[in-house]
Amino acid sequence: MNAIWIVKGIENVVKSNPKRLEELLANLRRDKELFEEIVISAYVEGLISLSKASELLEITRDEMAEILRKRGVPLRNLNKDDLVAEVEAIKWF
């Protein structure tokens, strides 16, 4: 089933009423498996960093890296967000 129209429809609704995005995200987060798939897909496409993916799933970066490894998803080189997160984690200790 080609459901590109759904994605376009969501995009249009969010453009006209940005507050609906939070509602949509809240609904997506209720289905943890689906939301995890979306986050992993965004990571694979390079749309978000490892740090952002772990933040969205409310897990540690190490847990996120393990999920990716189990799925056979290669880890990308650290970007600026990941490096900042690493420095902050080190400072915490």
From Swiss-Prot:
Coiled coil: none
Residues that span the membrane, as ranges: none
InterPro entries the record matches: UPF0175 (IPR005368), UPF0175_domain (IPR052264)
Pfam families for the chain: UPF0175
Family statement drawn from the similarity comment of this UniProt entry: Belongs to the UPF0175 family.
Classification via PANTHER family: UPF0175 PROTEIN SSL1255
Protein's name according to its UniProt entry: UPF0175 protein AF_0100
